[in-house]
Design a protein with these regions (language model features):
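N-terminal auxiliary segments of SAM/dcSAM-dependent transferases
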Residues: 1-51
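Class I SAM-dependent methyltransferase Rossmann-like catalytic core
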Residues: 52-91
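Phosphate/oxyanion-binding active-site loops and adjacent basic polyanion-contact surfaces
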Residues: 68-83, 105-112, 132-136, 185-186
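Conserved class I S-adenosyl-L-methionine
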Residues: 95-109
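Residues at the starts of beta-strands that form the adenosine-phosphate
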Residues: 100, 124-126
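Conserved SAM-binding loop of SAM-dependent methyltransferases across substrates and taxa
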Residues: 107-123
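S-adenosyl-L-methionine
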Residues: 122, 130-172
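A short SAM/SAH-binding and catalytic strip from SAM-dependent methyltransferases
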Residues: 172-187
Length: 188
């Protein structure tokens, strides 16, 4: 049985929680983290998963650190709320096609867009997912396959978003880039 209904239940709790419900958000984000770790099989202790990848454009954090970002429950809540609201706003103005959402630097879970799959169908939203770290990309692909989210995926690529070129005939309505704290200022 697919874990997607459980993920939808957890992400709905995150979206429905008040912004100041720290305890509730902490519990929900940790539940989501554990489910996604189980799906992807990430070994958080493996040395290779902790390695920062150096690129021409900066640094890409290791798989372990990317996976752990979801545990910052206030940050996760703010991003999920903002993306959900932006999607609702775009759905009011775009007709005849889905809203196209480009998510650059998805991490292993693309966690910030998972709530959208609980609230919208594939005719309403389509994702372009970009991830530069190979181990992280492989986990992302495993998660998409396990949850059977392919119908939502317009494009999924292992790519450096700072160098990636959007084909001229493809629209992007919402662009997601997780701006990280000062310690990650060199992350692309």
């Amino acid at each position: 049985m697919s874990p997607l209904p459980l993920i939808h239940s957890i992400t709905n709790r995150i979206l429905n929680a008040p912004k100041n419900a720290a305890g509730e958000l902490f519990v929900a984000c940790n539940e989501l983290y554990k489910v996604l770790l189980q799906i992807t099989g990430i070994d958080l202790e493996e040395a290779a998963n902790r390695q920062t990848q150096t690129l021409e454009s900066g640094h890409a954090i290791g798989l372990t650190w990317a996976a752990m970002c979801i545990q910052d429950y206030m940050r996760t809540k703010r991003f999920m709320d903002g993306i959900y609201q932006a999607t609702n706003d775009k759905l009011k103005t775009i007709t005849g096609r889905p809203v196209h959402i480009l998510y650059a630097g998805t991490g292993p879970f693309a966690a910030l867009i998972l709530p959208l799959t609980a609230r919208f169908n594939e005719k309403q939203i389509q994702f372009i997912l970009l991830e530069v770290n190979e181990q992280t990309f492989n986990c992302l692909q495993k998660m998409v396959d396990t949850l059977q989210l392919q119908k939502y995926i317009h494009r999924i690529e292992k790519a450096d978003a700072t160098k990636w070129k959007l084909p001229s005939n493809e629209p992007v309505d919402i662009f997601i880039s997780e701006t990280m704290q000062q310690a990650l200022v060199k992350e692309p």
